[in-house]
């Protein structure tokens, strides 16, 4: 696995600076200012209008003005990176707004048109996110439409790619970046759907095969009942976790893992045997990664589940089992704390998980599936590299990318230790492992 990751990094560094010629399009951005619906329509206009008219001077000043330290994005409340299109906003919302305008997309809300838009679930409903962009004052007239840029390039030399910049508006668009961004957007949207499913009552299944062959629940969350014990957890007092809390979250996360896996087209094309092999290899990693990433930050010595239950660095007596080696300290030191130091975004986290999931070395994966899984992993590694570097630039981005990939060894070691603990539980019967978890996580003899 490590060789594959290193090769992919070298490949993306080599291919990074090849610009794609932008198609010439004559558009009037003022057509995009109707805030009553999250839709974009196309009309022909004149590309000869001066840049000062298309991009008023006060907007240019706003774009250059630095945001105060700690300023939040007006759209999703993530940390703002600057004034984009007239509004203090993060790179994610800036890119989303620009892409929506330029690609003429139309979105439909599946609910009542009043979805919550915040940094954790901002990709769940693009209709409401685009409306929020307009509501807070993002100005489509501030976009420099590609046709204007092409006219400018014909007059003067083509601008060089700014390799040190993290802004995709300042870098030339390349084919692999466009493809990577589509991958990132899709994964981030699915991540939001997983968060919705975590708050729902998940139907029971008879086993892993039943779960794999059932329709994907991520697209049916509106039909599921909300689990009231998991709502508004941010306002609840924390309480020490019991073994029942841990058991409940293990089962829930592994059920969500299967629903998450079923959103990948390549995964759906695999036969059932290979599907089983991939999820068995990754299910507990999915559980572990989500546990620490979504744990509210109550310091480096505490993992907090989303229902308010917590585990300390020195686990409380009720979650200690005879003969089992504690793994929570390693989860904190080797995964949770590094994630926080890297300031991992939801998009980066979602793409990292996808790259880990498609493991061509997964036990019992058929030779026929290995090549397809290998290519799929490379696709998500490329998406991860783009996701990181477009935000913070190549030099810093390479370090962050490498730091993430180096964590895979720790993740594998923790998984091996968990497997050992499950074998001890099974041998000494000091805790009954849930049948679904056992089928999904314990390697066959």
Curated annotation (Swiss-Prot):
Function: Orphan nuclear receptor which acts in concert with the insulin/IGF-1-like signaling (IIS) pathway during osmotic stress, perhaps in response to a ligand modified by the sulfotransferase ssu-1.
Family affiliation: Belongs to the nuclear hormone receptor family.
InterPro entries noted in UniProt: HNF4-like_DBD, NHR-like_dom_sf, Nucl_hrmn_rcpt_lig-bd, Nuclear_hormone_rcpt_NR2, Nuclear_hrmn_rcpt, Znf_hrmn_rcpt, Znf_NHR/GATA
PANTHER family, per the entry: NUCLEAR HORMONE RECEPTOR
Compartments reported by the entry: Nucleus
DNA-binding region: 70-145
Any one GO molecular-function label of the UniProt entry: zinc ion binding
Segments forming NR C4-type zinc fingers: 73-93, 109-133
Protein name: Nuclear hormone receptor family member nhr-1
An annotated GO BP: cell differentiation
Biased composition (Polar residues): 36-51
Positions of the UniProt region annotated as Disordered: 19-55
Species lineage: Eukaryota, Metazoa, Ecdysozoa, Nematoda, Chromadorea
Residues annotated as transmembrane: none
């Amino acid at each position: 696995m490590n060789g594959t990751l290193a090769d992919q990094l070298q490949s993306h560094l080599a291919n990074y600076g090849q610009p794609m010629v932008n198609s010439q399009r004559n558009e009037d951005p003022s057509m995009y200012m109707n805030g009553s619906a999250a839709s974009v329509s196309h009309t022909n206009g004149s590309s000869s209008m001066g840049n000062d008219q298309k991009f008023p001077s006060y907007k240019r000043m706003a774009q250059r003005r630095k945001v105060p330290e700690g300023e939040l994005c007006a759209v999703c409340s993530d940390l703002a990176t600057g004034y984009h299109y007239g509004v203090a906003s993060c790179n994610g919302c800036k890119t989303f707004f620009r892409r929506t305008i330029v690609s003429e997309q139309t979105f439909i809300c599946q609910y009542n048109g009043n979805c919550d838009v915040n940094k954790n679930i901002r990709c769940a409903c693009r209709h409401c996110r685009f409306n929020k962009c307009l509501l807070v004052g993002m100005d489509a007239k501030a976009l420099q439409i590609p046709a204007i840029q092409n006219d400018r390039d014909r007059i003067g030399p083509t601008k060089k790619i700014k390799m040190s910049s993290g802004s995709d508006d300042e870098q030339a668009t390349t084919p692999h970046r466009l493809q990577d961004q589509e991958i990132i957007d899709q994964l981030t949207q699915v991540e939001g759907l997983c968060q919705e499913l975590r708050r729902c009552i998940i139907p029971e299944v008879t086993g892993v095969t039943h779960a794999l062959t059932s329709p994907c629940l991520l697209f049916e969350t509106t039909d599921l009942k909300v689990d009231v014990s998991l709502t508004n957890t941010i306002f609840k007092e924390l309480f020490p976790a019991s073994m029942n809390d841990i058991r409940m979250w293990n089962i829930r996360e592994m059920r969500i893992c299967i629903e998450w896996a079923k959103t990948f087209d390549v995964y759906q094309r695999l036969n059932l045997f290979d599907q089983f092999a991939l999820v068995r290899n990754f299910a507990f990693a999915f559980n572990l990664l989500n546990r620490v990433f979504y744990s509210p930050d109550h310091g480096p010595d505490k993992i907090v589940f989303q229902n308010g239950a917590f585990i300390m660095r020195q686990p409380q007596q009720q979650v200690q089992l005879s003969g089992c080696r504690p793994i929570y300290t390693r989860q904190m030191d080797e995964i949770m704390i590094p994630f926080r130091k890297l300031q991992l975004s939801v998009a980066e986290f979602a793409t990292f998980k996808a790259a880990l999931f498609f493991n061509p070395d997964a036990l019992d994966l058929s030779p026929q599936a290995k090549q397809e899984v290998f290519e799929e992993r490379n696709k998500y590694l490329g998406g991860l590299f783009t996701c990181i570097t477009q935000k913070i630039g190549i030099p810093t981005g390479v370090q962050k990318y490498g730091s993430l990939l180096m964590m895979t060894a720790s993740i594998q070691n923790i998984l091996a230790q968990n497997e050992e603990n499950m074998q001890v539980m099974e041998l000494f019967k000091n805790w009954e492992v849930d049948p679904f978890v056992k089928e999904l996580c314990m390697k066959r003899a």
